[in-house]
């Protein structure tokens, strides 16, 4: 029996207050021979076993009835592989001792994690099934530098924090432990004695899978295999590509009619994916799928940044959905939330008893609008956690793009704050320099590590250079949502047509700054909630005029420079606001052909026509790709412009935003010849009045608008038409 183990040490171990379990537990060399110590609550008998022979080589004596065992093997001097035969409740179990294994994290990994430069921290931290010294199990590691003790608790140890206290790697603040026998599918958490002596139970920040709310445990789950993007997927994100995005909330796109329950990832793969393909969209954008506790946050308050939500199935089911989208030729964009996280006790908030992931001062670390906490981007381990997450989704799931939510709230310290409620940066300014550097670094790493993948910014201010390279002072995003265009055009469209002539600039102003960024034109989920009404319901007039206005607006939007984004339901003119707790109003498309079918057909035709003609997308961000033909006819609310591709092919776009047909409307053109009407939002095919130009019109050598040749058209009421030059 050992006399060297102090009673206070045993008490501290059993009470869960001992920070260095490996200094006591496991096998140790002593003058009397090898000494084996184990903490095995509720055990009654413990033997040391030699695995090769199965022979008992020594019995451990119970030094404390609460489960501390110790024994000396006097004839042994060199460490050897051993097992423990433990009797619990009259039944003997053969186990491998977690405390006989050496350090898990390599020194280089520990150094990179501490420096915040480990590109893929998720390959080291978290829970990873592994085999060590011939023993299968799971290695656990978690960053909690200020905790006094950390244990792994889970289904494999009765959720008992005494059984598996972890080793602290002081140089990095990471706790680690290999637990033999712990396997994929088992639930676990980390139990911490925090910096203040309080007990905390935390989910794993790096968990690859988690329980569905209201449960909060993490799940042991293997790291997904890497996904290699195809050349076609890489090209589909380029600036000259047609990009038409269908924005979807997976929980409310469609539901089971019998119980209003969600569709699974696999059901969505079978229903949503072919629908989006049929509609002609090029990209699917998913509202956040990271695990989150509150349905009403729509995923924008995530607690499991590395775990796809279990609401719709398993992690592998989600991969199945992504693969189905790719097989259908759809790229997938994931809404990504690196700006803030909820204050739920089981998550990142005060993780080790200190403000580890967030700022300690609420003027920097608390988001008043959303009652959430703000990441401390200046802490290297925190920014590393987030940058690694971006790579994780792209490399391990094949996500083609990330849309970063609420960028303005990240880059401005005074965002939504009054004077005295925020702290200036080191230079006295309002910019969050650490957040700006984090975004630049993330975008740089995406570009270097995942060729063809891109990022998009929802940035609501006039911050200069969101889509410009960091070396020129930009943030390095590929695309930025044009929220200014969206607000201006919706403000215009909601006006009674009689008043539109006084607000003509709302449609033209966007071109004054159009080439300052690479823009996406978004009609997103944010525009159909919180009392804003549906897009259809914002249109003025009676029912016929509402639909006509909407069709004209869509025709304008799809032709205007910039990539396109449409939230689900808008493609068939849903009449009510979006409700995340219910399905879209698919019943509007039941029965006979109606106005909703007309809008749906229009959006489908817009997508396919837009994709087919390079003039509509190839030079979105080049001044050569756009030219006004009629910009000043505010009295009749008529606007006409040309879209152009690199080869000089032109498409003419003409919009009449009044209910008065404009017959014999003459305007100058660049290229004389025969022009075909390839799209008319007033067509009877879309349930319009079918006013138009009979398919083909020829130019006249009559000067107009400063040009030698002109066209004489009929402009339908509340409509947009597209014309393509067919020849001389």
UniProtKB/Swiss-Prot annotation:
<dbReference type="Pfam" id="PF00128">
    <property type="entry name" value="Alpha-amylase"/>
</dbReference>
<protein>
    <recommendedName>
        <fullName>1,4-alpha-glucan branching enzyme GlgB</fullName>
        <ecNumber>2.4.1.18</ecNumber>
    </recommendedName>
</protein>
<dbReference type="Pfam" id="PF02806">
    <property type="entry name" value="Alpha-amylase_C"/>
</dbReference>
<dbReference type="GO" id="GO:0004553">
    <property type="term" value="F:hydrolase activity, hydrolyzing O-glycosyl compounds"/>
</dbReference>
<dbReference type="InterPro" id="IPR014756">
    <property type="entry name" value="Ig_E-set"/>
</dbReference>
<dbReference type="InterPro" id="IPR006407">
    <property type="entry name" value="GlgB"/>
</dbReference>
<dbReference type="GO" id="GO:0043169">
    <property type="term" value="F:cation binding"/>
</dbReference>
<dbReference type="Pfam" id="PF22019">
    <property type="entry name" value="GlgB_N"/>
</dbReference>
<keyword id="KW-0321">Glycogen metabolism</keyword>
<keyword id="KW-0320">Glycogen biosynthesis</keyword>
<dbReference type="GO" id="GO:0003844">
    <property type="term" value="F:1,4-alpha-glucan branching enzyme activity"/>
</dbReference>
<dbReference type="InterPro" id="IPR013783">
    <property type="entry name" value="Ig-like_fold"/>
</dbReference>
<dbReference type="InterPro" id="IPR004193">
    <property type="entry name" value="Glyco_hydro_13_N"/>
</dbReference>
<feature type="active site" description="Proton donor">
    <location>
        <position position="458"/>
    </location>
</feature>
<comment type="subunit">
    <text>Monomer.</text>
</comment>
<dbReference type="InterPro" id="IPR013780">
    <property type="entry name" value="Glyco_hydro_b"/>
</dbReference>
<comment type="pathway">
    <text>Glycan biosynthesis; glycogen biosynthesis.</text>
</comment>
<keyword id="KW-0328">Glycosyltransferase</keyword>
<dbReference type="InterPro" id="IPR006047">
    <property type="entry name" value="Glyco_hydro_13_cat_dom"/>
</dbReference>
<feature type="active site" description="Nucleophile">
    <location>
        <position position="405"/>
    </location>
</feature>
<dbReference type="GO" id="GO:0005978">
    <property type="term" value="P:glycogen biosynthetic process"/>
</dbReference>
<dbReference type="InterPro" id="IPR054169">
    <property type="entry name" value="GlgB_N"/>
</dbReference>
<keyword id="KW-0808">Transferase</keyword>
<dbReference type="Pfam" id="PF02922">
    <property type="entry name" value="CBM_48"/>
</dbReference>
<comment type="similarity">
    <text>Belongs to the glycosyl hydrolase 13 family. GlgB subfamily.</text>
</comment>
<comment type="function">
    <text>Catalyzes the formation of the alpha-1,6-glucosidic linkages in glycogen by scission of a 1,4-alpha-linked oligosaccharide from growing alpha-1,4-glucan chains and the subsequent attachment of the oligosaccharide to the alpha-1,6 position.</text>
</comment>
<dbReference type="InterPro" id="IPR006048">
    <property type="entry name" value="A-amylase/branching_C"/>
</dbReference>
<dbReference type="InterPro" id="IPR037439">
    <property type="entry name" value="Branching_enzy"/>
</dbReference>
<dbReference type="GO" id="GO:0005829">
    <property type="term" value="C:cytosol"/>
</dbReference>
<dbReference type="InterPro" id="IPR044143">
    <property type="entry name" value="GlgB_N_E_set_prok"/>
</dbReference>
<keyword id="KW-0119">Carbohydrate metabolism</keyword>
<dbReference type="InterPro" id="IPR017853">
    <property type="entry name" value="Glycoside_hydrolase_SF"/>
</dbReference>
């Amino acid at each position: 029996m050992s006399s060297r183990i102090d009673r206070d040490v045993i008490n501290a171990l059993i009470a869960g207050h001992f920070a260095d379990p490996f200094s006591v537990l496991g096998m140790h060399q002593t003058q009397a021979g090898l000494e084996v110590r184990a903490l095995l609550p509720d055990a009654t008998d413990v033997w040391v076993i030699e695995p090769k022979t199965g022979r008992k080589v020594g019995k451990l004596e119970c030094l404390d009835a609460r489960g501390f065992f110790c024994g000396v093997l006097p004839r042994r001097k060199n460490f050897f592989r051993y097992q423990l035969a433990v009797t619990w409740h009259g039944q003997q179990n053969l186990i491998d001792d977690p405390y006989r294994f050496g350090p898990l994290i390599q020194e280089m990994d520990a150094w990179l994690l501490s420096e915040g430069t480990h590109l893929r921290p998720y390959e080291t931290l978290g829970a990873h099934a592994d085999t060590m010294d011939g023993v299968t199990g799971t290695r656990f590691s978690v960053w909690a530098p200020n905790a006094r003790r950390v244990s792994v608790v889970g289904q494999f140890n009765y959720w008992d924090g005494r059984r598996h206290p972890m080793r602290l790697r002081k140089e990095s603040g990471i706790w680690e432990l290999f637990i033999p026998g712990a396997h994929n599918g088992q639930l676990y958490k980390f139990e911490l004695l925090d910096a203040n002596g309080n007990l905390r139970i935390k989910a794993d920040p790096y968990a690859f899978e988690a329980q569905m709310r209201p449960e909060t445990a993490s799940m042991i789950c293997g790291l997904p295999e890497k996904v290699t993007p195809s050349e076609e997927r890489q090209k589909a994100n380029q600036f000259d590509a047609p990009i038409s995005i269908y924005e979807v909330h997976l929980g409310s796109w469609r539901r089971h009619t019998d119980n209003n329950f969600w569709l699974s990832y696999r059901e969505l793969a079978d229903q949503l994916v072919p629908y989006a393909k049929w509609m002609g969209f090029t990209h699917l954008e998913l509202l956040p799928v990271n695990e989150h506790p509150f349905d009403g946050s729509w995923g924008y308050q995530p607690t499991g940044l590395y775990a796809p939500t279990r609401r719709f199935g398993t992690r592998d089911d989600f991969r199945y959905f992504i693969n189905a989208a790719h097989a259908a030729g759809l790229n997938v964009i994931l809404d990504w939330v690196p700006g803030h996280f909820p204050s739920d006790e089981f998550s990142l908030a005060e993780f080790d008893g200190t403000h580890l992931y967030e700022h300690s001062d609420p003027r920097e670390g608390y988001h008043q609008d959303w009652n959430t906490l703000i990441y401390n981007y200046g802490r290297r381990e925190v920014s590393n956690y987030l940058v690694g997450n971006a790579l994780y989704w792209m490399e391990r799931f094949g996500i083609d793009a990330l849309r970063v939510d609420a960028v303005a709230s990240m880059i401005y310290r005074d965002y939504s704050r009054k004077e005295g409620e925020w702290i200036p940066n080191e230079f006295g300014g309002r910019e969050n320099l650490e957040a700006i550097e984090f975004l630049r670094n993330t975008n740089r790493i995406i570009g270097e590590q995942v060729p063809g993948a891109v990022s998009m910014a929802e940035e609501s201010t006039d911050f200069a250079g969101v889509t410009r390279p960091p070396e020129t002072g930009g943030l390095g995003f590929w695309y930025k949502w044009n929220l200014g265009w969206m607000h201006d055009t919706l403000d215009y469209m909601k006006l009674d047509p009689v008043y539109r002539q006084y607000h003509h600039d709302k449609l033209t102003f966007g071109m004054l700054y159009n080439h300052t960024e690479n823009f996406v034109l978004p009609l997103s989920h944010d525009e159909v909630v919180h009392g804003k009404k549906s897009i259809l319901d914002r249109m003025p007039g009676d029912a016929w005029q509402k639909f006509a206005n909407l069709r004209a607006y869509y025709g304008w939007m799809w032709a205007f420079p910039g990539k396109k984004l449409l939230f689900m339901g808008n493609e068939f003119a849903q009449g009510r606001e979006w409700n995340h707790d219910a399905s879209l109003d698919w019943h509007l498309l039941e029965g006979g052909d109606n106005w909703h079918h007309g809008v749906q057909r229009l959006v489908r035709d817009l997508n396919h026509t837009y994709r087919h003609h390079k003039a509509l997308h190839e030079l979105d961000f080049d001044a050569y790709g756009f030219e006004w033909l009629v910009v000043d006819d505010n009295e009749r609310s008529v606007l006409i412009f040309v879209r152009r591709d690199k080869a000089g092919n032109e498409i003419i776009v003409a919009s009449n935003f009044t209910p008065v047909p404009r017959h014999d409307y003459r305007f100058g053109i660049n290229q004389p010849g025969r022009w075909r009407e390839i799209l008319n939002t007033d067509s009877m095919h879309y349930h319009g009045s079918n006013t138009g130009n009979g398919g083909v019109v020829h130019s006249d050598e009559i000067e107009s608008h400063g040009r030698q040749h002109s066209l004489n058209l009929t402009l339908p009421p509340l409509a947009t038409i597209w014309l393509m030059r067919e020849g001389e």
